[in-house]
Amino acid sequence: MKIINSFKKTFLFTFCLLFFSAHTHSITLEKTPVSLNNPWGMSWADDQLLITQKSGEIFLVNTNDYTKIKIDHKIPFVQHGQGGLLDIVSDKNIVWVTGSIKKNGKYTTAIYRAELKNNILINEKLIY
């Protein structure tokens, strides 16, 4: 019985080595000419990236020519300690942004939903 169990383990191990071998991938890093200070989160929007900076700015960066446009918003994020403007997620023209806000004298994390129109976040709404 021990011989059969040992054989099964050896067979399974050999099978895994043969059919699930590791493949190497080549990765090339490219330094871009976009200047950012403390970038934190990013989200793809077609051929562009929405990038947040911890200090509160949001930029739309074209990934073809690396032009950068500042997105105007009125979301009251505050940079304090490790907090600030954090992650961003987009789906078409809808954007969700997380970050630190001050509420009742204390710092907490909040999520806002907004629409991106003409490089401005509009209809900003606190959802959490």
Protein language model regions, located:
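Bacterial N-terminal signal peptides that target proteins for export
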Residues: 2-12
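N-terminal signal peptide c-region/cleavage motif recognized by signal peptidases
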Residues: 19-21
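Acidic, Gly/Ser/Thr-rich repeat motifs that build Ca2+-stabilized beta-propeller blades
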Residues: 25-128
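General helical structural elements
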Residues: 12-13, 117
